[in-house]
Amino acid sequence: QVGDHIVGIASSGLHSNGYSLARKVLEKSGLKPEDAFPGADGATVREVMLAPTIIYVEAVRSLLRDLNVKGMAHITGGGFYDNIPRVLPAQVEARINFGSWQMPPVFRWLKETGDLSWPEILQIFNGGIGYVMVLPPDQSEEAISRIQAFNLRAWHIGDVARRSKGDGGETEQVVVNF
């Protein structure tokens, strides 16, 4: 519904997506698995690249019990652009505010070292958001608080809006404000 909030839950890193490209970028960089990963507070390349995927089930169940969760999507292959539209009616779009969440350093490193754009990072990888939930605006802060109680980080990353037309008449269902 127009006006609903989109809450994003942090990923732990790559999860299970984009490893072919990440491996190519890693090879280009010359970093070795035991090297310190740039900007990762002493974690090694191996630890950053193979960080275990977060399991969201307990936090999600908590919200489903008591809140009006209108949609949810696991941000897997296809990133924001392929996964978020799966939970939206055709007449609306997700407007995502880039920078409204804390992105793990691996994504900035992949962008810079791999000469990628931010849209590519959000298409190929999860960009630091592993799961999204759509809720009424008056429930998003409570949702974030509950998610944090499970030692997960969460943010209000965007809103649902009436779907707009692009310059060529095409419509996109995920619009990221960079």
Regions found by a protein language model. Name each.
Residues 33-50, 54-178:
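Glycine-/charge-enriched secondary-structure boundary and capping motifs
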Residues 1-36:
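Phosphate/diphosphate-binding glycine-rich loops and adjacent basic-rich segments that engage nucleotide
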